[in-house]
Curated annotation (Swiss-Prot):
The gene is cobA. Keywords: Cobalamin biosynthesis, Methyltransferase, Porphyrin biosynthesis, S-adenosyl-L-methionine, Transferase. This is Uroporphyrinogen-III C-methyltransferase. It holds the Pfam family TP_methylase. Its EC number is 2.1.1.107. The keyword S-adenosyl-L-methionine applies. It is a step in the biosynthesis of both cobalamin (vitamin B12) and siroheme. SUMT exhibits a substrate inhibition phenomenon at uroporphyrinogen III concentrations above 0.5 uM; this property might play a regulatory role in cobalamin biosynthesis.
Length: 238
């Protein structure tokens, strides 16, 4: 029986992967990697390693999650060392929990290798501290891809009134809705907000504004996915 490593590749800059994550790449017989993994990291793989792309775009998945789970199990049962390489951290909106469940159900040995998530790293590369002694004592990760209130389980009231800094993932297409919900539930229109496109990468771009102005700014600057959204007074440090 082989073993599976669920590895966080970090937010984009290849230098931000952990040493343990790098070792998992170097020893793997099979690597399954996602769209937001910097491909430079694949250069550390063994020359005879099988490398499989599992990238996902909004509304389009190269491989369905169930297929990925089955691959992990299949290769491990063949005695392979399998590295599942994910952007950021595997347990922060990376579906790593689902993959771990599948491995447990099949009795597959596995290990979690945490990675630096873009909610912290992209903000840092833009000069934004997600916490600050004077401005932010609380911080939350939020999934921003729910398209309407009918399918939205996010507790916007709690986020708007109870959290100082928000890092919102996968939210660019939903930006008008996100801003609307935050203002509806207590944030003022003057609340600072930043969008960081391709955070930590060579072509990173950052735009800033307020909840009341950012939708027009993003449209004018043509900011698209992948982008991290940071909301809170700490944005003023950018």
């Amino acid at each position: 029986m082989g073993k599976v490593y669920l590895v966080g590749a970090g937010p984009g800059d290849p230098d931000l992967i952990t040493l343990k994550g790098l070792k998992a790449i170097q020893q793997a017989d099979v690597i399954l990697y996602d769209r937001l993994v910097n491909k430079d990291l694949l250069e550390y793989a063994k020359s005879d390693a099988d490398i499989i792309y599992c990238g996902k775009l909004p509304n389009y998945h190269t491989l369905k999650q169930e297929t990925i789970n089955n691959f992990l199990v299949k290769f491990a049962k063949k005695g392979k060392i399998v590295t599942r390489l994910k952007g950021g951290d595997p347990f922060v909106f990376g579906r790593g929990g689902e993959e771990a469940e599948a491995l447990v159900q099949q009795g597959i040995s596995f290990e979690i290798v945490p990675g630096i998530t873009s909610g912290i790293a992209a903000a840092a590369y833009a000069g934004i501290p997600v916490t600050h002694r004077e401005y932010s004592a609380s911080f939350a990760f939020v999934a921003g891809h729910r398209k309407d209130s009918k399918h939205d389980a996010i507790k916007w009231d709690s986020l708007a009134k109870g959290v100082d800094t928000l890092a919102i993932y996968m939210g660019v297409r939903n930006l008008p809705y996100i801003c609307q919900q935050l203002m509806k539930h207590g944030k003022t229109s003057a609340t600072p907000i930043a969008l960081i496109h391709w955070g930590t990468c060579a072509d990173q771009r950052t735009v800033t504004g307020t909840l009341g102005t950012i939708v027009d700014i993003v449209k004018e600057e043509q900011i698209e996915n992948p982008s991290m959204i940071i909301v809170g007074e700490v944005v003023n440090f950018s």
